[in-house]
Amino acid sequence: IILAINSKNNFDDAIKVIRDHKYMILKENHFASIRINWNDKIQNIKEIAKEVNIGLDSIVFFDDDPRNCEIIKIALPEIMTINLPKDPSFYLPLIQSMNDFNTLKITNEDKKRGEIYHKQKQRVELKEKTDNLEEYLKKLETKVNIKNVDESTLSRISQLTMKTNQFNLTTKRYTEEKVRSMMNNSQMLIGGVQVEDKFGDSGITGTFIIKSENIEEWKIDTFLLSCRVIGREVEQAMMSCIVDKAKKEGVKRIIAEFISTKKNLPASNFLEKCGFKNKGKYWVFDLSKEFKRPASISIDIK
């Protein structure tokens, strides 16, 4: 769960309560985005979504003013809007009655989510101060660690397949049991992608699942990346690792499929950008060709 504040208020007065009130458990660093101003809440929500890089349909808006709730429902119907009762003592029972925040298991990334999105804000600020994308990527000093999936990480891999919508080539959903089954299959290769940079560790934010069709051909079953690291050439780094591994194994070609959904437009031209050729249903990469690694990223395969 990512926390954000969208409040019509005087910033100095409101932030003082957050910082100094003795009964305020949540502090400034617990919120991934803060909009305390006199702007309309519709615009604030759009800015929050852009800042933390999530879709509007992933947002739940809580407000104790029925008018604000009605405005958001009309203007942004994809958002779940909850009109809070006037008595704060009813807040907790209301939230506990909702199924939307239920989770079967908490991963390490879940525990660090607030910190991760606080660091994301610092990246946005750096990007705004940098003249061009190439310079920004250099300043980030991004490192990508590719790890074989094991019992300690399979929960996160399953979670990514269940939740990732935007940069996801096939949008296949896998339970932990299914990931474990594939992990123990000698014909399958599953990689967990950990991303870190000068601002900190973003955790495992991507995964790929490869099936060895035969000695000459690999098929990309799943290739996805969390929205918070999209646009930093991490996806190209992931693909370069797959290409390098395939070449070492003597594979001749890699085939992949893009299955279009309402939400995965950001991934629609990725295979073409990587040099895959469209062969009808599948895209094919000829491994006799070179694949250019991103110059701004260091890669460690473990």
Regions found by a protein language model. Name each.
Residues 24-28, 35-42, 49-52:
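Active-site phosphate-binding/coordination module
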Residues 51, 73-142, 244-302:
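Terminal substrate-recognition subdomain of acyl/acetyltransferases
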Residues 45-66, 72:
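Conserved Lys-Pro-Asp/Glu-containing loop-to-beta segment of HAD-superfamily phosphomonoesterases
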Residues 195-198, 204-280:
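Acyl-donor binding region in acyl/amide transferases
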Residues 8-15, 42-44, 66-70, 89-90, ...:
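Flexible loop/turn segments at secondary-structure boundaries
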Residues 1-22, 34-36, 153, 169-174, ...:
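Substrate-recognition element of Asp-dependent hydrolases with the DxDx(T/V) motif
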Residues 141-173:
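Short amphipathic alpha-helix that is part of the acyltransferase structural core
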